[in-house]
Amino acid sequence: MSERLSGHTLLVSLLATPIRHSLSPKMHNEAYAKLGLDYAYLAFEVGTEQLADAVQGIRALGIRGSNVSMPNKEAILPLLDDLSPAAELVGAVNTVVNKDGKGHLVGHITDGIGALRALADEGVSVKNKIITLAGVGGAGKAIAVQLAFDGAKEVRLFNRQATRLSSVQKLVTKLNQLTRTKVTLQDLEDQTAFKEAIRESHLFIDATSVGMKPLENLSLITDPELIRPDLVVFDIVYSPAETKLLAFARQHGAQKVINGLGMVLYQGAEAFKLITGQDMPVDAIKPLLGDE
């Protein structure tokens, strides 16, 4: 990358913590090189305490855009000038665009688009399907919105944090008003309801952090009877590539198991397009993600 850097190079950033596991710098910098774009992508260890200063830095330095990940997806909202309709509905942002480097920052959310493109890539359609989704943080809410917009029959949301349930219920109400999808929300602590939902679902999506370190030895599903030959299991975690959940589902005969690498690729491709105006060469970038 050093050979490409010049006084004209445009900077794109990632604001998150931790960042060591992130595939984004590799993915975006390789895409810039493939397309001959004079951009550089750098990851910065930024938590919520440093976030306001970091956002001001984007404005002051003319950084052209930034990806935003945990724990900043919701905390960044009041620091931006505008939100896309999807980001406003979800209440979270994972991409910030500084158009022309003039300091007017617009927040977008590409997680839902990325997840649905990843599923489509695996031949999985959500239209008219019953789907159970665990975890309604920034990514989970974005996926829920996209599932409803893409014509799922039912989306059954489960979340463990009782304090978040009331805010997510507002999103549920909006989705039931705006789409034909039936969206419900329940506490993940209600294991009876959780298991019943999975038994009736075509697709189970884990959008929690269970499966990542330090929770890599845990799985939301531990009952073999919940895994059926017609059930697709999608875990948005990508490191490790096979979480405890995916290994369990594969072992007990799930129709298909999908990790989060495809979602990373396609949400990144959408962010890439928003910031650069160019299509990411996903076919060239996809093989690189398997090197991790």
Curated annotation (Swiss-Prot):
Residues holding NADP(+): 135-139, 236, 260
The EC number(s) this enzyme carries: 1.1.1.25
For this UniProt record, the keywords arranged alphabetically read as follows: Amino-acid biosynthesis, Aromatic amino acid biosynthesis, NADP, Oxidoreductase
Among the GO biological process terms of this entry, one is:
shikimate metabolic process
CDD domains, alphabetized: NAD_bind_Shikimate_DH
Q: Which residues participate directly in catalysis?
A: 73 (proton acceptor)
Q: Which GO terms describe its molecular function?
A: NADP binding; shikimate 3-dehydrogenase (NADP+) activity
Q: Report the superkingdom from the record.
A: Bacteria
- UniProt xrefs under InterPro entries: Aminoacid_DH-like_N_sf (IPR046346), NAD(P)-bd_dom_sf (IPR036291), SDH_C (IPR041121), Shikimate_DH (IPR011342), Shikimate_DH-bd_N (IPR013708), Shikimate_DH_fam (IPR022893)
By sequence similarity, the record places it as follows: Belongs to the shikimate dehydrogenase family.
Known partners and oligomeric status:
Homodimer.
- How is this protein named in the record? Shikimate dehydrogenase (NADP(+))
Which species is listed as the source?
Streptococcus pyogenes serotype M1
Instruction: Report which gene this protein is encoded by.
Output: aroE
